[in-house]
């Protein structure tokens, strides 16, 4: 009887140790793909996708935004590519905890082009990337939110749709 109790306790302990982790797999979400800008959005409830709507914009289709992209690497760097040959790198960090899902960029460096000369969507994207504090998403899309969780940019992995 004592052996059964010990065995049962060991199985229960093992189940507790291998239980579900309520955090995101950061590398599988962000790395290994090129993320293309799909649009700029506003929301009243960041947990409810039905509460968001696109901000007015002068682009005609999502293909107009395909030149705006980010590639995240497992070493913690990101390459941001914008029109006019402008490329920047930054360090990125994400916490996949279900309650927080924090995200940040730091240590920006210009690789090519002149970010000061950017206008339109390129300037808007770069300005918003520098204010990103939170994220939501999966391996198909990511949303990068500002500190208020009211404005976000959505990016898509277009290879998933080809």
Positions of predicted regions on the chain:
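Sec-dependent bacterial lipoprotein signal peptides
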Residues: 1-18
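Lipid interaction determinants
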Residues: 20-91, 95-162
């Amino acid at each position: 009887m004592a052996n059964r109790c010990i065995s049962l306790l060991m199985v229960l302990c093992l189940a507790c140790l291998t239980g579900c982790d309520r955090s995101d797999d950061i590398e599988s979400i962000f790395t290994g793909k090129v993320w293309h800008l799909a649009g700029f959005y506003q929301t009243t409830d960041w947990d409810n996708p039905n509460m968001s709507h696109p901000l007015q914009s002068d682009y005609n289709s999502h293909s107009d935004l395909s030149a705006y992209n980010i590639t995240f690497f497992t070493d913690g760097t990101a390459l941001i590519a914008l029109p006019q040959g402008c490329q920047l790198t930054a360090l990125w960090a994400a916490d996949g905890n279900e309650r927080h899902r924090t995200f940040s960029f730091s240590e920006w460096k210009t690789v090519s082009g002149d970010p000061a000369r950017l206008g339109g969507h390129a300037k808007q994207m770069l300005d918003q990337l520098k204010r990103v504090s939170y994220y939501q998403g999966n391996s198909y899309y990511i949303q990068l939110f500002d500190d208020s969780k009211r404005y976000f940019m959505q990016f898509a992995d277009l290879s998933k749709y080809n």
